[in-house]
Amino acid sequence: MKPPISIQASEFDSSDEEPVDEEQTPIQISWLPLSRVNCSQFLGLCALPGCKFKDVRRNIQKDTEELKSYGIQDVFVFCTRGELSKYRVPNLLDLYQQYGIVTHHHPIPDGGTPDIGSCWEIMEELATCLKNNRKTLIHCYGGLGRSCLAACLLLYLSDSISPQQAIDSLRDVRGSGAIQTIKQYNYLHEFRDKLAAYLSSRDSLSRSVSR
């Protein structure tokens, strides 16, 4: 696949300038089965495509072409724009769109958690993608903290799954580093109560406005 015409070669490091890109390993996508929550789909998780930081030197166009070849239709990005610049992929969101991948950008600070309203928006968008059988991928920087938290929350929406079962499911596919901070761990455990309170207050507000 040729790179989109509107993307200038100078915006991305070319493989001619960095021969190491020729030898890079394929982007590693972990596929989380959602059968435990009565969904036949799999949710993809990965680290930041195209990342150039410290000893990581990936080629953004190759990674994006790989995602396209996997059939990815929707991607959820949890990196902030500051992170995208830091890791030298400032135009990643535009590139996804130019390759025909629907992009959902929900920035969450590294190691942090979303506010409950933003979290519910993410859950609704994820559920819609999966319900419509769209091949969906989520990523942050390392694909272990924020992405794994979002995937855990999606599982935990099911009454049949405990927080630890959700974490174990993610660690089965992403390794022991999944869910990286105490803040994320606590957020998961408190999620159902906070979500119930949020939805209740939202419904109350809606009723008062409609009167």
Curated annotation (Swiss-Prot):
Residues forming coiled coils: none
Active site (record annotation): C140 (phosphocysteine intermediate)
Protein location: Cytoplasm, Perinuclear region
Reactions performed catalytically: O-phospho-L-tyrosyl-[protein] + H2O = L-tyrosyl-[protein] + phosphate; O-phospho-L-seryl-[protein] + H2O = L-seryl-[protein] + phosphate; O-phospho-L-threonyl-[protein] + H2O = L-threonyl-[protein] + phosphate
Ranges where the record places region Disordered: 1-20
Cell cycle in keyword set: yes
One CC-aspect GO term: cytosol
Source organism superkingdom: Eukaryota
Keyword Signal in annotation: no
Biological processes, Gene Ontology terms: DNA damage response; regulation of cell cycle
Enzyme class: hydrolase
InterPro entries in the record: CDK_inhib_3 (IPR008425), CDKN3 (IPR022778), Prot-tyrosine_phosphatase-like (IPR029021), PTP (IPR050561), Tyr_Pase_cat (IPR003595), Tyr_Pase_dom (IPR000387), TYR_PHOSPHATASE_DUAL_dom (IPR020422)
MF terms (GO), sorted A to Z: protein serine/threonine phosphatase activity; protein tyrosine phosphatase activity
Boundaries of every Tyrosine-protein phosphatase domain copy: 32-200
Protein keywords: Cell cycle, Cytoplasm, Hydrolase, Protein phosphatase
Stretches the record annotates as Interaction with CDK2: 1-34
Family membership noted in the UniProt record: Belongs to the protein-tyrosine phosphatase family.
Stated role: May play a role in cell cycle regulation. Dual specificity phosphatase active toward substrates containing either phosphotyrosine or phosphoserine residues. Dephosphorylates CDK2 at 'Thr-160' in a cyclin-dependent manner.
Protein name: Cyclin-dependent kinase inhibitor 3
Annotated source species: Mus musculus
